[in-house]
Amino acid sequence: MNYCPNCGTQRIESAAYCPRCGHALSNPVSQPSQENQGMPVTAEMPATPDMPATPDVIWGAEEAPSTAAGQVPWRGGQVVLGIILVLVSLIPVTGIAFAVGALAGRYDDATIVWVSVHLMAISIAMVVWRLGVHKRPAPWRLLGLNPMRYPLAKSVLLALGALGGSLLLTVIYSAVVNLFNSDTFSPPDIGGEIAFPGAAAFFTFQAVALVTPITEEVFFRGFVFSGLIPRFGVAKAMVLSALVFSAFHLSLGVLVPVFLTGLLLALLYRKTGSIWPCVLAHAGQNALAVALKIYA
């Protein structure tokens, strides 16, 4: 079989899943044994969603996590377990953050935000490392932390496009909610107390507009989205990962806009083959939100 029966994309030799839609391919074609030809054992560089694998790293055959384009070594089971573990970690993270915040006096809210962001980053890093990339060659590439497919200028423009689309959808959603005068589904009003005052606001920006975008994009796009593609295909994986991303924000008022943002970020990751444009778009939105709370 030379083409995917689901979407018609030409298959790659030995690929277990279609590089475009993630459909499972039957009767994979075996590659000739390189060992039998007296050649060093090589494996293709594991690819991000929709990015063809490249044979630029030499691994032992037992170490190579995947040679199929768009395939990662973890699957839906690890994704579900990872989501559960991160959710459970919210309990100790919240307890520690509030305990530390109680010692900060008038800056308790800002301290709680800063501490919780960094503790969640550690939690996510541990979960992703253990369930996804532990003992895997080039783990950063498996998570999309690789160079972008397009030139820098085009990648930045795509990120800005995703940011603009997210902001526009959020404005439209807020207008619709206000039209129906629904307090339940209105975005929550977050006070300026979440930020440190004066020059110390740098630490709030560092937490919310740098650490949060990196860790969330690695988890929701690099780990969850990529891990769901082989089982559900790209479109369903985008929807499911966006739903998880939205649910993690624990507020009915942002459920819809965050879901739409999650779709845009998954599409951006799919388009660029790298997490970094997603981080840029995510960071821009968070930085704008913090700046409005501090300076507006």
Q: What name fits each language-model region?
A:
Residues 105-114, 139-212, 230:
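Juxtamembrane helix-loop-helix connectors linking adjacent transmembrane helices
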